[in-house]
Amino acid sequence: GAVSPSAVEEALLREPEAEAVILPSPNYYGICSDILAIAEVVHRYGKLLIVDQAHGAHLKFFEGRLQEKYGIHLSFPPSAESSGADIVIDSTHKTLASFTQTAVLNVFGKRPDISAIEDKLQAVESSSPSYLLMASLDINADLMKEKGSLLVKKWQDNLSRFYEEAVSVEGLRIMKTEGLDPTKINLDMSAHGFSGNDLENFLMERGIFAELVSGNI
């Protein structure tokens, strides 16, 4: 589930020497933590907030987009970039269009020490980077700049259509919870005796491949 601001504050009280709070949001299921509230807590204690937004690189492009279509209301959680995080890591290859293994480290405000970050990166990065991978990041940035609005609109339309039609499938339960990213679709057919693996095999036979199977989801 989501990481609560109170849990973050409890952790900071237990570990007063900590210099930063690092947390993932959204998680693998698309559940987002309240980064805005967490950032307020973290900064009140004089710490940095680092968000691993590996599964949420797309959220920035959905901000402010509410959609009411096919009788379905879609709203999207805010990105960590817009919620006060100091450092945000986006795995652009997961939900955007860059090649596998690519990601972006975003730094905001004056709290992070840019020089220290650059020094640490030199210790872990290769001295022979893949220019193919780096080029794919540039291409992804250009794509989202030039066609991002159109692509996101089509994405929203497809999501609305899916959720509208899924309502008519007897026994199909779709996970709904506060802070859930609608682009992450969590299906449960246990009402018909389907386990998660059964549902995965059923979908695979029809050319649809699940990203994760866990229990009945």
Residue ranges and their predicted role:
Residues G1-K176, M189:
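Conserved PLP-enzyme active-site core in the AAT-like
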Residues R161-I217:
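Conserved C-terminal alpha-helix-loop-beta "cap" of PLP-dependent enzymes
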